[in-house]
């Protein structure tokens, strides 16, 4: 992200598709980039520990080309570029900005709260797994204690599971239909809510981070990865003011 923030550091687009590797084990990505490195002189920089901030970006030679392997999921990478990033993430399509749901959330008389339930691909990932129900139950209770008149907007890629399994008595609305190329609309809607309960997902992470409410309450899971060893630096994923359960 910090490389994107400065034009002179921008990484050239890689002319190959990685779509076929989606939902595969992480080691497949590793092998793939290792093979490419054998045939190219570009340096491969690997994130050794997920989410741990690496200071190497201040030392790289911007005249050279690099391949970065990892999630680089740490807000410390773009400190000082927050406004630039928010501008880049702001949709320019008025039909999206002024959509019925967006207008409803912005003008709501309630304290709007987004909740993201990420399942689907997480069920077979092996690297990341769905957050347990207790997390959401406890997070909702915290919101009720901190926020008056909350109204919850539910975002999920498994609405049937939510309706059948999450027996929670809260005022809510299920948001569906924004998939594939329109999935970004859900991030926009999350960001327009006053508060956020996120999953262990960069999708809802960005929705909460882009939320510009200065008094927002954001609740995130402590456990981010399926393997406990990978959670060693998971605390660095979220800003310090967010609540981790």
Which positions does each model-derived feature cover?
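Secretory-pathway luminal glycosyltransferase catalytic domains
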Residues: 2-147
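Short, low-complexity, polar/charged sequence segments that are solvent-exposed and flexible
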Residues: 20, 87-89, 132-137, 171-175, ...
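Donor-binding and catalytic core of enzymes assembling or modifying cell-surface/extracellular glycoconjugates
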Residues: 142-229
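Leloir-type glycosyltransferase catalytic cores
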Residues: 226-245
């Amino acid at each position: 992200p910090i490389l994107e923030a400065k034009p002179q550091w921008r990484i050239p687009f890689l002319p190959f598709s990685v779509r076929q590797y989606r939902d595969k084990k992480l080691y497949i990505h590793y092998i793939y980039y290792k093979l490419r490195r054998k045939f190219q002189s570009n340096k491969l920089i690997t994130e050794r520990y997920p989410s741990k901030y690496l200071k190497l970006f201040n030392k790289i030679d911007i005249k050279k080309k690099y391949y970065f392997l990892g999630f680089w999921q740490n807000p410390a990478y773009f400190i000082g570029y927050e406004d630039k990033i928010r501008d880049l993430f702001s949709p320019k399509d008025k039909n999206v900005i002024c959509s019925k749901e967006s207008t409803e959330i912005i003008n709501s008389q309630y304290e709007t709260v987004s909740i993201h339930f990420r399942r689907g691909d997480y069920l077979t990932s092996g690297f990341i797994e769905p957050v347990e129900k207790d997390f959401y139950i406890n997070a909702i209770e915290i919101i009720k204690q901190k926020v008056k008149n909350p109204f919850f907007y539910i975002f999920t890629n498994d609405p049937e599971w939510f309706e059948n399994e999450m027996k929670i008595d809260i005022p809510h609305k299920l948001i569906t239909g924004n998939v594939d190329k329109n999935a970004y609309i859900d991030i926009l809607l999350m960001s327009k809510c006053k508060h956020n309960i996120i999953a262990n997902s960069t999708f809802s992470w960005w929705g909460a981070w882009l939320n510009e409410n200065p008094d927002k309450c954001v609740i995130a899971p402590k456990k981010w990865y399926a393997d406990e060893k990978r959670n060693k630096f998971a605390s660095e994923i979220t800003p310090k003011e967010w609540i981790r359960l």
